[in-house]
Amino acid sequence: MINKTRTTVDQSEIDHFSRIAAEWWNPQGKFRPLHKFNPTRLAYIKEKICLAFDRDPFSLAPFAGLKILDIGCGGGLLCEPMVRLGATVIGADAAQNNIEVAKIHATQSGLSIDYRATTAEKLADKGEKFDIILNMEIVEHVADVDLFISATAKMLKPQGLMFIATLNRTWKSWGLAIVGAEYILRWLPKGTHDYKKFLKPQELKKLLLTNSLKVIDELGITYNPLNDSWNRSKDMDVNYMLLVKRLQ
């Protein structure tokens, strides 16, 4: 049972994303960067899941039979493609406004997704278990990272995979993800990120290890301004992803 006095919810973060929830599905709006790098992270997720679960990536529903949790799902930008690939998906977000937007868009798209306005710790207390857990661009927004990782670790099945995408705590990430993206290019609303919440990969790996999880792959996601594209990279100074599984 998770300590009821602790919470992963940072109310200022919830308020911030609630104010701009209607923008989730506008590719030219406030979530434009997510729309731009979504194909890159989706390709990586699909590749690794198919490899781990011995699925044919060219089949119509390679994720059939897999139960996926997208925690901090926002408007459902990852939930919808996961369902289209055949998975059973629960999308969870602490912001009710995000969940309402996600539900409406899923209905309009004819997709069945179990969206819930809840937190990782509440889901963990219910004993939920998943084949895949997506912690994408959420770690840097929670109030208690230790509790968040502990809660999500409890929900991962023995042979499951966890994907984590977040921002490194470097001067480069401060300059690009905050000064550049929020204040100069205006890609994101001011205040979207708090540099103090960024985690270095080694810090996150240590936290994962204390929860009996290990990193089996890692990569950076970098932006190319020449063709306005995001690509996989060895450069993890700003955006990076970790692929995680249980210690055997």
UniProtKB/Swiss-Prot annotation:
Q: Fetch the SUPFAM superfamilies from UniProt.
A: S-adenosyl-L-methionine-dependent methyltransferases (SSF53335)
Residues reported in the UniProt entry to bind S-adenosyl-L-methionine: R41, G72, D93, M136
Q: Lineage of this protein's species?
A: Bacteria, Pseudomonadati, Pseudomonadota, Alphaproteobacteria, Hyphomicrobiales
Look up the record and name the pathway of this protein.
Answer: Cofactor biosynthesis; ubiquinone biosynthesis
Instruction: Mention any Pfam family matching this sequence.
Output: Methyltransf_23
Give the protein name, as stated in the record.
Answer: Ubiquinone biosynthesis O-methyltransferase
InterPro entries per UniProt: SAM-dependent_MTases_sf (IPR029063), UbiG_MeTrfase (IPR010233)
- Reaction catalysis annotation: a 3-demethylubiquinol + S-adenosyl-L-methionine = a ubiquinol + S-adenosyl-L-homocysteine + H(+); a 3-(all-trans-polyprenyl)benzene-1,2-diol + S-adenosyl-L-methionine = a 2-methoxy-6-(all-trans-polyprenyl)phenol + S-adenosyl-L-homocysteine + H(+)
Q: Which family does it belong to?
A: Belongs to the methyltransferase superfamily. UbiG/COQ3 family.
Q: Which HAMAP family match?
A: UbiG (MF_00472)
Name the gene that codes for it: ubiG
EC primary class: transferase
Family matches, as NCBIfam families: UbiG (TIGR01983)
Keywords from the named record:
Methyltransferase, S-adenosyl-L-methionine, Transferase, Ubiquinone biosynthesis
